């Protein structure tokens, strides 16, 4: 599989990657709203922001599960490459740095790119974005994850619904399974049937299992009905 690693001229981490001498293609658009169609899959390396400014390496699939959008379209999910995300995440966990490595729930755009896209990020403040040592370690983990993708062993491709945005459950499940879209608890009450179907279909490898993380019984009916009708086994946590 031909994986295109890209950065943005509008992103500080992209500029740190550039200073380190990597020759990845550079786009001139915002990382949440751009067009790109080269390669079989895409990896965007960029900044991560959070109000807590906690140092972290993060990875996620893009998409807007709800009616509001940050780049891309509302209620629209990008195509997920679960094996690629999982291979890179496993490589990230081996980085020799005492900072958090975690899988985030699906969020932000772009959503309409015709290829699978994975976001790999470092955060959560300018000090981290400009830290050449840590950014370099992250880039090398990405390259190693891409190199090992085809040999990455996954028992299942798994969807996760519920739980927090920073999914420690996904980070645990990724030890055995490939992680597809994660729809956090913040979207469950407004989750449309269309987005549930997209979370199943917008994948290059069709998910076979779904984990429901602390979703109240009153909010499960539509979700479990659609999952069951698509022959996806359901595990309640």
UniProtKB/Swiss-Prot annotation:
Q: In which organism is this protein found?
A: Metallosphaera sedula (strain ATCC 51363 / DSM 5348 / JCM 9185 / NBRC 15509 / TH2)
Q: What does this protein do?
A: D-aminoacyl-tRNA deacylase with broad substrate specificity. By recycling D-aminoacyl-tRNA to D-amino acids and free tRNA molecules, this enzyme counteracts the toxicity associated with the formation of D-aminoacyl-tRNA entities in vivo.
* Top-level taxonomic group: Archaea
Q: Look at the named UniProt entry and state the broad enzyme category this protein falls under.
A: hydrolase
Query: Which family, according to the similarity comment?
Result: Belongs to the DtdA deacylase family.
What InterPro entries does the annotation carry? Deacylase_DtdA_archaea (IPR018033), DtdA (IPR007508)
Please give a single GO biological process term from the UniProt record: D-amino acid catabolic process
Instruction: Specify the protein name.
Output: D-aminoacyl-tRNA deacylase
Self-association state and partner proteins as the record states: Monomer.
Q: What is its EC number?
A: 3.1.1.96
């Amino acid at each position: 599989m031909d994986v295109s690693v890209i950065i943005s001229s509008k992103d500080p981490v992209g500029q740190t990657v550039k200073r380190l001498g990597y020759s990845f293609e550079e786009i001139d658009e915002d990382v949440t709203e751009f067009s790109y169609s080269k390669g079989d899959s895409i990896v965007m390396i960029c900044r991560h922001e959070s109000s807590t400014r906690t140092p972290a390496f993060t990875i996620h699939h893009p998409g807007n599960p709800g009616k509001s959008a940050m780049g891309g379209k509302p209620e629209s999910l990008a195509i997920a490459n679960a094996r690629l995300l999982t291979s890179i995440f496993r490589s990230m966990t081996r980085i020799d740095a005492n900072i958090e490595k975690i899988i985030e729930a699906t969020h932000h755009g772009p959503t309409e790119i015709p290829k699978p896209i994975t976001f790999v990020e470092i955060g959560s403040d300018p000090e981290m974005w400009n830290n050449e040592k840590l950014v370099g370690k992250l880039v090398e983990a990405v390259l190693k994850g891409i190199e090992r993708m085809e040999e990455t062993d996954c028992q299942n491709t798994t969807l996760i619904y519920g739980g927090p945005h920073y999914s420690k459950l996904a980070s645990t499940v990724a030890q055995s399974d490939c992680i597809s879209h994660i729809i956090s608890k913040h979207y469950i009450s407004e989750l449309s049937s269309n987005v549930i179907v997209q979370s199943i279909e917008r994948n290059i490898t069709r998910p076979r299992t779904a984990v429901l993380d602390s979703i109240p019984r009153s909010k499960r009916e539509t979700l479990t009905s659609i999952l069951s009708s698509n022959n996806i086994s359901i595990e309640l946590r």
